[in-house]
Amino acid sequence: MCVIIIKNNNNKIPNKTLQKSSVVNPHGLGIVWLDTYKIEYTDSKNYSRLDTNRPFIAHFRYATVGKVGLSNTHPFRCGKSHEYLMMNGTIRTLGNDRECDTKVLANKISKKDRNEWKNILSQYSCRFVSVNTKRKQYQIYNKDLFTKVDGVWYSKTNVLPSVYVGVYGTLKRGHGNHRLLMSSTFIGKGKTNDRYPLTISSLPYLHKQENVGHNVEVEVYKVDHPTLEQLDRLEGHPHFYKREVIEIRMNSGRLLSAWVYFVQSRSHKNEKLYKRYGGH
């Protein structure tokens, strides 16, 4: 279902990430070079074009609606304007065997007032980016569905390498949600390097306030990004819990960085603070 990569910095994206983007999405590559706002259309196999310090927005296509070919490679011009649109997702009510859904949407939205675009696109559970080649600007829509890693925005995470996740609650061994980590690699046990408030009210809640509470006990797993997306759905990221990177001191003494979920809406005021969940 495609991937959009937004790299508006001078860093390089790991070659393995670019290669996987090409393999998973083999049906066309569109590139907007953000230093010139020139657009390039090519085959996905030419992903090495992105092995550069230049800033860009790239769209690797996985065809679900419309034929495979450069004519259906994103981004698409919106009418006769200087605006172009790319999408990660599928709108089944648009497009046909020849023309992809995003191409139809680009023509459709070009007839609407520019100020209405955000509201129109937010009705779809897809990720969008529009680019104005005259003003040299771009806009991300449904940004909460994107993931930012090392300063780069990704519309899907299945092209990214595995990451570390520290879990302190029902995702630990012996608890109900551990099933989501059954295919992940257990790295070991440790504690948060900084102190955080952990409260327990039937379920555990870790609060993002450093130097309050305890060094909380966690289990660390190496997970792929499809699993990470499952964890995000379970935890209601980024609204109920929010995933953030913190340092974990492993029992072996090793210090590593891992994603940990912090509750967003609850207060720990006047509540008992714990070191661990389970056997507490």
At which residue positions do the language-model features occur?
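Conserved beta-strand-loop-short alpha-helix elements that form
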Residues: 82-96
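Extreme N-terminus nucleophile/cap motif
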Residues: 1-46, 56, 145-153
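Helix-start/capping segments and mature chain N-termini
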Residues: 94-110
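Cytochrome P450 core scaffold surrounding the K-helix E-X-X-R motif
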Residues: 66-69, 94-97, 174-182
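Glycine-aromatic micro-motifs
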Residues: 10-11, 109-127, 135-146, 151, ...
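Residue-level signal for inorganic ion chemistry
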Residues: 31, 89, 105, 231
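Acidic loop->beta-strand submotif enriched in PP2C/PPM serine/threonine phosphatases
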Residues: 66-86
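Short beta-strand scaffold segments in enzyme catalytic cores
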Residues: 2-6, 28-34, 74-76, 84, ...
